């Protein structure tokens, strides 16, 4: 199996990315709608030619805009799985799965028993052999997606692209597909790029996470690092942590555009004037109806934008911060929310102890190897 390398600029979609995925590795790509996730996959698959860039798979160059190279999609050894399984409605499940290998190896007209045996083997891999003689219209959404996975893997791709393949499936079907993907992808050894909005997909399937914002890479790294200490706006929102942007002042605090000071523990040396971010969980935030007194060094007043009950707790969030970062959030008990009479439009004060705040260098556009 081969390592995937991508460098692509697509001007009209504002995409400018560079990253790589090793054989046997799963890279999850997160980002808001319109960030460029699907565009990046389409460039890899050969469905979209970039304005500038390179797609390399091991020692094979699939796209090179400078050299004028653009290998056809069907010759790339790239499997693509979308939200819609896109099964051929007139073919049986077994014939759908056999289609990929037949195209790749020129097996059309070869022995019927041979092609069926190959299809059944891949259907067994995804626990769908019992559907071999059915037509796609006779399958549920989860069953059809299993067949689509088998068809993609049957062509023995070096790269598997999964574009939100679990969207639209019910909880049970999605759980089953995750289990199938986890096992068959590990055995296949191919490089995998997965786009998703679901953290469960990331936790169960991915080795690394890439966060796309406005067509560029905001951050990339191991799953645990990105989701426990995110350094991008979208990463913070999806991971459920607070993120504040600013620069380091002479006293070591983070100073925001509005003039607020945030004190915390730097994760590395942060010189004065360095762009940085403060990260802390909503559970570390205390909420008061008036400015509090005492030991906490970080106090900020805000107007409540939303209140969301989550079981025994209530998430209180302010309006988006200057610059577009998500509003600060606090996680408090139902009793505390009732006592505070917190509601959208309420004026409250958030208080956070300095030891609960981590100060990180601000993220910048970068690539991965």
From Swiss-Prot:
Entry keyword set: ATP-binding, Cell membrane, Membrane, Molybdenum, Nucleotide-binding, Translocase, Transport
Reactions this protein catalyses: molybdate(out) + ATP + H2O = molybdate(in) + ADP + phosphate + H(+)
InterPro entries: AAA+_ATPase, ABC_transporter-like_ATP-bd, ABC_transporter-like_CS, Mo/tungstate-bd_C_term_dom, Molybdenum_import_ModC, Mop_domain, P-loop_NTPase, Transp-assoc_OB_typ1
GO biological process terms, semicolon-separated: transmembrane transport
Pfam families: ABC_tran, TOBE
Start and end residues of each ABC transporter domain: 4-239
Binding site for ATP: 31-38
EC number(s) reported in the record: 7.3.2.5
Membrane topology according to the record: Peripheral membrane protein
Chain ranges of the Mop domain: 293-361
Described purpose of this protein according to its UniProt entry: Part of the ABC transporter complex ModABC involved in molybdenum import. Responsible for energy coupling to the transport system.
Self-association and partners: The complex is composed of two ATP-binding proteins (ModC), two transmembrane proteins (ModB) and a solute-binding protein (ModA).
Protein name listed in UniProt: Molybdenum import ATP-binding protein ModC
High-level lineage: Bacteria, Bacillati, Actinomycetota, Actinomycetes, Mycobacteriales
């Amino acid at each position: 199996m081969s390592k995937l390398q991508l460098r692509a600029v697509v001007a009209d979609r504002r995409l400018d990315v560079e990253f790589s995925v090793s054989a046997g590795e799963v890279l999850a790509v997160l980002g808001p709608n319109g960030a460029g996730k699907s565009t990046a996959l389409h460039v890899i698959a050969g469905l979209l030619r970039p304005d500038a860039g390179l797609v390399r798979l091991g020692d094979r160059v699939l796209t090179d805009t400078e050299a004028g190279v653009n290998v056809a999609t069907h010759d790339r050894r790239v499997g693509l799985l979308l939200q819609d399984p896109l099964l051929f409605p007139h073919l049986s499940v077994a014939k759908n799965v056999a289609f990929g290998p037949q195209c790749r190896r020129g097996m059309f007209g070869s022995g019927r028993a041979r092609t069926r045996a190959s299809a059944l083997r891949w259907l067994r891999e995804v626990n769908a052999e019992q559907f071999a003689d059915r037509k796609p219209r006779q399958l549920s959404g989860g069953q059809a997606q299993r067949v689509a996975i088998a068809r993609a893997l049957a062509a023995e791709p070096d790269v598997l692209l999964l574009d939100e393949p679990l969207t639209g499936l019910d909880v049970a079907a999605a759980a089953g597909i995750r289990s199938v993907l986890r096992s068959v992808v590990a055995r296949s050894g191919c490089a995998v790029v997965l786009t998703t909005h679901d953290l469960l997909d990331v936790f169960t399937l991915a080795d690394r996470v890439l966060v796309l914002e406005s067509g560029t890479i905001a951050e990339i790294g191991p799953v645990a690092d990105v989701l426990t200490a995110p350094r991008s706006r979208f990463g913070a929102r999806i991971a459920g942590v607070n993120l504040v942007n600013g620069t380091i002042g002479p006293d070591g605090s983070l100073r925001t555009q509005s003039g607020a000071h945030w004190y915390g523990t730097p994760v590395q040396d942060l010189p004065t004037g360095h762009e940085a971010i403060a990260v802390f969980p909503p559970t570390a935030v205390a909420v008061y109806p008036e400015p509090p007194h005492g030991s906490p060094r970080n106090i900020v007043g805000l107007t409540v934008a939303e209140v969301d009950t989550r079981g025994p707790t209530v998430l209180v969030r302010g309006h988006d911060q200057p610059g577009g970062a998500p509003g600060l959030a606090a996680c408090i008990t139902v009793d505390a929310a009732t006592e505070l009479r917190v509601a959208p439009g309420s004026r409250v004060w958030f208080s956070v102890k300095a030891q609960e705040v981590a100060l990180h260098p601000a993220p910048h556009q970068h690539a991965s190897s």
